[in-house]
């Protein structure tokens, strides 16, 4: 028996499509009954075979499913199935489907496949990457997310349909991934308006005040940013005046139609008025205008700055482009106030109306900016601060973050912003044994400061200036990187052998996908120039130790495989660069921490061992997220975030039991 699809194509009958559709309808109706689903599927197949037709129309099959559900008294499931059919018919009639490089025919089987993720992976996917579809009144399915991301990536440079289909199939089956940022924003208006939202990693040297504009903007679009605040960097900044008075106009929100999108600075006698625009650009411009007023001597006659927040949308209003809700004007007011306090405190410290900011001031300002940012209503700020080896003030910046009050530890609110960044010493030369001993002792207490070896970085790239917050990408100032990942464990076959050809092909696709991301023009010129010059790729691996455990690969075998994977990525990247006429990538491979993406296939993160044979994986979620409420109703372990009000937390934590694949785990190996 065959099936005639709406396109007219005839394909073999497969009862699994019916079983999948009935299962989804039953789950939506709360009538999930595996035995009942089997009975309905078998009854539908029997009816169709009894009709004796060589090819059955898809509509006839769906009608038969409805009839059978009613006959077997699955009334709620029948209703859910009918509503689903009606919704799909509306979508087809509206012409919403716009066929790209991936055809409807190619995608059709994936729509009916079971989700390849286990419970933890499915939860993390739904929380993190599945976008809400307002016209359908639901979140994306996995096949739709992959389609959106792959269509976006392959649109950035000429790509064959065969390559796009291979990439899609690998991502769908969790063998490899584009960056988590692209899974979230790729193919949406966000990616068109804010291309830099695709990038995981960025870095800037704070040697001019424009760097703070860029830092603020990048954090708002969701990138993690490293900042370097060495003494030599601070010396390049112009002095700041510390006698400007800031007044905050009381907030009186204007209607949406009257809001300014961009920030407006006007002058009247000795007063400047800063009307902040209601956009990411507007907020970043406001910060730039402030620094211009306190650094440019042409504004010395301005004694007062009045800040107008009326165009900023009220707290809680839905953000249509990025998703999430608005933070309101309060966070912006707090940010400007705290930055100005840093500036005026520097003047009081030095006893001067005009003074040079020190590295600790620069670090404080970067952290205050980070404190103000909640990107897309989903992700909080990710920063790293790189400081001098002899800068005790910066090194000890977080030493007194907590203090005892009436027998309880409380955070010092005046410096609470300093928790926004992890800080590392930027060693420009080899430290003495005594210095290293001291450093290790410091790390025993709080894990900080970390260290960055500039000499080692310069051997790998001559213009190395710093790194991203996770520390795995070597960057020049105004440099960024988009990361891709191959799940090595997914290429272990049932007999315990490794599918090397499939793995190497995935690495080739990973490098090509990464290079395509460098072909997108970025919205900030300084960053776009560095991007086009360096074309950095970040081809990463995950599930490595799971693969080693499963295949028994020894150290020599691992080294050989890593060499092959590196060579494959470099070759693919260089070939694509030559094909498109762009620069060959300066760097191609890396290993990132692989936190969130590794949870989708639930494999060991990056090249790390699994934590233990059995462990509890805890995942944070916003307390008001409907997904959180569903998990609570289903009886999942849901707990308030540590340190928050147990009765009314803003963040909750879900617990998932995880069983690691057989083999060595973290406790079975030494630290070296």
List where the protein language model places each region.
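Extended catalytic cores of very large enzyme megasubunits
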Residues: 1-672
């Amino acid at each position: 028996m065959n099936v005639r699809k709406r396109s007219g194509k005839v394909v073999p009958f497969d009862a699994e499509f019916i079983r999948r559709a009935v299962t989804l309808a039953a789950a939506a109706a709360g009538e999930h009954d595996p035995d009942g689903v089997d009975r309905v599927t078998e009854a539908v197949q029997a009816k169709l075979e009894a009709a004796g037709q060589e090819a059955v129309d898809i509509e006839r099959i769906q009608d038969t499913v409805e009839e059978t559900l009613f006959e077997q008294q699955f009334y709620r499931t029948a209703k859910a199935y009918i509503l689903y059919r009606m919704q799909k018919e509306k979508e087809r009639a509206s012409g919403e489907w716009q066929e790209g490089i991936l055809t409807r025919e190619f995608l059709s089987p994936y729509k009916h496949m079971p989700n390849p993720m286990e419970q933890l992976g499915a939860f993390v996917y739904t929380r993190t990457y599945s976008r809400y579809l307002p016209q359908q009144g639901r979140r994306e399915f996995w096949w739709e997310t992959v389609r959106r991301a792959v269509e976006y990536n392959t649109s950035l440079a000429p790509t064959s349909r065969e390559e796009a289909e291979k990439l899609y199939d690998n991502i769908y089956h969790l063998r490899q991934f584009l960056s988590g940022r692209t899974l979230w924003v790729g193919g949406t208006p966000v990616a068109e308006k804010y291309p830099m939202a695709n990038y995981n990693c960025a870095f800037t040297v704070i040697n001019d005040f424009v760097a703070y504009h860029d830092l603020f903007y990048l954090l708002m679009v969701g990138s993690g940013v490293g900042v370097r605040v060495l003494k030599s960097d601070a010396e390049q900044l112009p002095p700041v005046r510390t006698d400007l008075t800031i007044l905050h106009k009381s907030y009186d929100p204007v209607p949406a139609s009257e809001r300014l999108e961009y920030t407006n600075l006007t002058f009247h006698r000795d007063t400047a008025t800063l009307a902040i625009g209601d956009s990411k650009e507007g907020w970043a411009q406001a910060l730039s205008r402030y620094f211009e007023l306190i650094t440019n001597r042409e504004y010395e006659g301005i004694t007062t700055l009045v800040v107008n927040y009326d165009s900023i949308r009220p707290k809680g209003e839905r953000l249509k482009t990025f998703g999430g809700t608005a933070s309101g004007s309060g966070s912006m007011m707090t940010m400007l106030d705290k930055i100005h306090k840093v500036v005026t405190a520097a003047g009081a410290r030095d006893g001067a109306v005009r003074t040079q900011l020190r590295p600790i001031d620069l670090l404080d300002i970067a952290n205050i900016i980070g404190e103000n940012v909640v990107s897309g209503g989903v992700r909080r700020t990710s920063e790293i601060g790189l400081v001098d080896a002899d800068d005790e003030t910066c090194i000890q910046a977080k030493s007194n973050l907590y203090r005892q009050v009436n027998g309880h530890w409380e955070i010092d609110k005046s410096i609470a912003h300093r928790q926004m960044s992890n800080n590392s010493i930027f060693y420009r030369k080899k430290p003495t044994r005594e210095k290293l001993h001291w450093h290790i002792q410091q790390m025993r207490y709080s894990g900080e400061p970390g260290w960055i070896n500039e000499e080692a970085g310069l051997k790998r790239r001559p213009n190395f200036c710093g790194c991203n917050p996770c520390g795995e990408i070597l960057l020049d100032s105004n440099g960024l990187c988009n990361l891709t990942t191959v799940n090595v464990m997914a290429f272990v076959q049932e007999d315990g052998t490794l599918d090397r050809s499939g793995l190497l092909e995935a690495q080739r696709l990973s490098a090509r996908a990464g290079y395509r991301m460098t072909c997108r023009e970025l919205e900030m010129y300084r960053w776009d120039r560095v991007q086009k010059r360096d074309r950095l790729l970040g081809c990463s691996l995950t599930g490595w130790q799971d693969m080693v455990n499963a295949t028994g690969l020894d150290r020599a075998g691992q080294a050989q495989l890593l060499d092959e994977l590196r060579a494959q990525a470099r070759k693919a990247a260089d070939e694509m660069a030559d094909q498109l006429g762009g620069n060959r990538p300066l760097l191609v491979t890396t290993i990132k921490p692989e936190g969130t993406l590794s949870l989708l296939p639930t494999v060991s993160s990056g090249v790390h061992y699994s934590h233990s044979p059995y462990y509890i994986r805890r995942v944070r979620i916003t307390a008001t997220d409907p997904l959180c409420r569903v998990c609570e109703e289903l009886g999942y372990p849901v707990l308030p975030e540590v340190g928050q009000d147990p009765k009314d937390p803003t963040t909750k934590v879900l617990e998932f039991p995880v069983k690691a694949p057989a083999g060595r785990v973290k406790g079975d190996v030494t630290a070296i």
